[in-house]
Swiss-Prot record:
Database matches in Gene3D superfamilies: 3.30.420.40
Gene Ontology cellular-component terms listed: cytosol
Binding-site residues, ADP: T14, R18, T268, G311, G412, N416
Keywords, in A-Z order: ATP-binding, Glycerol metabolism, Kinase, Nucleotide-binding, Phosphoprotein, Transferase
Highest taxon of the lineage: Bacteria
Self-association state and partner proteins as the record states: Homotetramer and homodimer (in equilibrium).
Family membership noted in the UniProt record: Belongs to the FGGY kinase family.
Record-given protein name: Glycerol kinase
Stated regulation of activity: Activated by phosphorylation and inhibited by fructose 1,6-bisphosphate (FBP).
Length: 508
C-alpha cells in the first residue's frame, strides 16, 4: 500500500520559525514552532544570528515529523516562505556568515538611504525597482556589511562571499551549499532588482559598489530549485519547489489570483497587497510596486502598503504598559469601553510606513481626558491598526483606479472580532476572514505542490481556502468620516511634533 504524501511549508518569520505539514485538502496535519533570540546592538538596530535561524528551522522540521509520525519519505515537496529583506552575507567556501543577519526592521543603514536620496537617485530607483529608498530594503544592508566588516569588500570582489535573503540562506543550507537561488518576490524587495526587465540592475549595483557575483540566481516562485541533502532532512532527498516572501505567499494562499483582489496580513506589522495583474503600475502616492508572484512563465505585479506597527501595538499594551495580560484580552477590554472614540493612538514607534514614509515620527496619543479609562486606551490602540489600513486602502484605490469591494484578511490580529468589525466600518467594505489563517505557509505549500503536480493547477486550489467569516460595514457614513478625519489630524500633529524637534536640532 502506498503511503499518503504531504507538502511541508517552512515559514521563517521575524521572531520564530515554523514547519507545517499540509495534506491534499490544504489542511494542517502537523506543525512545530521555535522562537530564536533577537539581537539589539544599539537603539533602532535589529539583528539575528543566521546560524540560530538555521538551527531553529532544523528543529521545527524534526518537530513536525515527531508530532505527526509522518516520515521524510512522505514529503512530496517543500515550500519556503520567509521574513523579507533581512540580509545575510556569508563565506562561499565555509558557509559561515561574516556578520549577523540585518533584519528588515533595522534602521542602522538609514544614513546610507538618506545619502542616496540626497544624491538624487529616488526617481531612478523607484522606476526600476518599484520601491522608495529606505533602510527597510536589502541593498543598504549589504552595503553596510561590506563597509563594516574588515576586508569584506575585497573578498566580495574576489567572489568569496555570497548574499542572500532568508529564502536563499535556507535553500543553500538545506542543499548543503549546492544551490544559490532566490525568487521573484524576494528579489523584488532588495532594491537591486529591476522588476520590469526581471534582472539584477547593473546601474544600481554600480552605484552601491555591490559585486554581482554575490547575488543569487532569480527563479520563478514555483519550480524545482534543488533537493535537500539527505543529512539535512532526516534521510530524505526532497524537492524544494516553492518560494515566496511572507506577504506574497499570503497573497497566493488567499487565492487572490485576479487583478483587484486585495489581502491584508495582520502580523507584527500589517501588509496590504493588491494583485495588479501583468502590468507594472508605479505608485504616485508612496505605495510600493512589487512582484506578487511569477508562475508558469508569467509574472503578476502587485501594489503594497507596509504598516510597521500592527500586532506589535497589542504586544506593547501587554509587555510595555502591562494593561493586558494576554493579547486576546484586548478585545474584551475594547468592547467594555464607553468612550465616544475621541482617543487616538498613533503607534509610530519606528516611524510611519505607507503612505507617509516618515522614519522620524514617533508614537503619540491624543484626546485624553480625566475620564479616559484603560478600556478606552486599549480600544484606541486597536482602532489605530484599522485607521492605518484605511490610509493604505484609500491610497491603493487612487493609484490603481480600482474600487476595492472586499479585503481578505489573515494573521494573528485578524482573530480579533472587534477589530475586524471596526475595520469593515472604517473602510465601508466587506472584510473576509480566511477559514484557514495559516495563509502564508499555505501559499508556500501551494507553490511547492503545483511545481511537482501534487495539485494539478491553480483552479484546483480554489476550493481549498474558503472564507471563514464575513464582516459587513454597519457604521453610518458621517460618523465614519468624522472618526477618520480625527485620525488624519492626529497623524499630522505627530509629524509636526518631530519636525519641530528636527528644526531645533538644525538651529543648534
Amino acid at each position: 500500500m502506498s503511503q499518503e504524501k504531504y507538502i511541508m511549508a517552512i515559514d521563517q518569520g521575524t521572531t520564530s520559525s515554523r514547519a507545517i505539514i499540509f495534506n491534499q485538502k490544504g489542511e494542517k496535519v502537523s506543525s512545530s514552532q521555535k522562537e530564536f533570540p533577537q539581537i539589539f546592538p544599539h537603539a533602532g538596530w535589529v539583528e539575528h544570528n543566521a546560524n540560530q535561524i538555521w538551527n531553529s528551522v532544523q528543529s521545527v522540521i524534526a518537530g513536525a515529523f515527531i508530532e505527526s509520525s509522518i516520515k521524510p519519505s512522505q514529503i512530496e515537496a517543500i515550500g519556503i516562505t520567509n521574513q523579507r529583506e533581512t540580509t545575510v552575507v556569508w563565506d562561499k567556501k565555509t558557509g559561515v556568515p561574516i556578520y549577523n543577519a540585518i533584519v528588515w526592521q533595522s534602521r542602522q543603514t538609514a544614513p546610507i538611504a538618506e545619502q542616496l536620496k540626497q544624491d538624487g537617485h529616488t526617481k531612478m530607483i523607484h522606476e526600476k525597482t518599484g520601491l522608495v529608498i529606505d533602510a527597510y530594503f536589502s541593498a543598504t544592508k549589504i552595503r553596510w556589511i561590506l563597509d563594516h566588516v574588515p576586508g569584506a569588500q575585497e573578498r566580495a570582489e574576489k567572489g568569496e562571499l555570497l548574499f542572500g535573503t532568508i529564502d536563499t540562506w535556507l535553500v543553500w543550507k538545506l542543499t548543503d551549499g549546492a544551490v544559490h537561488v532566490t525568487d521573484y518576490s524576494n528579489a523584488a524587495r532588495t532594491m537591486l532588482y529591476n522588476i520590469k526587465d526581471l534582472t539584477w540592475d547593473d546601474e544600481i549595483l554600480e552605484l552601491l559598489n555591490i559585486p554581482k557575483d554575490m547575488l543569487p540566481e532569480v527563479k520563478s516562485n514555483s519550480e524545482i530549485y534543488g533537493k535537500t541533502a539527505a543529512f539535512h532532512f532526516y534521510g530524505g532527498e526532497v524537492p524544494i519547489s516553492g518560494m515566496a516572501g511572507d506577504q506574497q505567499a499570503a497573497l497566493f494562499g488567499q487565492l487572490a489570483f485576479e487583478p483587484g483582489m486585495v489581502k491584508n496580513t495582520y502580523g507584527t506589522g500589517s501588509f496590504i497587497i493588491m494583485n495588479t495583474g501583468d502590468e507594472m503600475q508605479l505608485s504616485s502616492n508612496n505605495l510600493l510596486t512589487t512582484i506578487g508572484y511569477g508562475i508558469n512563465g508569467k509574472v503578476h505585479y502587485a501594489l503594497e502598503g507596509s504598516i510597521f506597527i500592527a500586532g506589535s501595538a497589542i504586544q506593547w499594551l501587554r509587555d510595555g504598559l502591562k494593561m493586558i495580560e494576554t493579547s486576546p484580552e484586548s478585545e474584551q477590554l475594547a468592547l467594555a469601553s464607553t468612550s465616544d472614540d475621541e482617543v487616538y493612538v498613533v503607534p509610530a514607534f519606528t516611524g510611519l510606513g505607507t503612505p507617509y514614509w516618515d522614519s522620524n515620527a514617533r508614537g503619540s496619543v491624543f484626546g485624553l481626558t480625566r475620564g479616559t479609562s484603560k478600556e478606552d486606551f486599549v480600544k484606541a490602540t486597536l482602532q489605530s491598526i484599522a485607521y492605518q489600513v484605511r490610509d493604505v486602502i484609500d491610497t491603493m484605490q487612487v493609484d490603481s483606479g480600482i474600487d476595492i469591494q472586499q479585503l481578505r484578511v489573515d494573521g494573528g490580529a485578524a482573530m480579533n472580532n472587534m477589530l475586524m468589525q471596526f475595520q469593515a466600518d472604517i473602510l465601508g467594505i466587506d472584510i473576509a476572514r480566511a477559514k484557514n489563517l495559516e495563509t502564508t505557509a499555505l501559499g508556500a505549500a501551494f507553490l511547492a505542490g503545483l511545481a511537482v503536480g501534487y495539485w494539478e493547477d491553480m483552479d484546483a486550489l480554489k476550493e481549498l481556502n474558503a472564507t471563514g467569516q464575513l464582516f459587513k460595514a454597519s457604521m453610518n457614513e458621517s460618523r465614519k468620516e468624522k472618526l477618520y478625519k480625527g485620525w488624519k489630524r492626529a497623524v499630522k500633529a505627530t509629524q509636526v511634533f518631530t519636525q519641530e524637534e528636527d528644526a531645533d536640532d538644525d538651529a543648534k
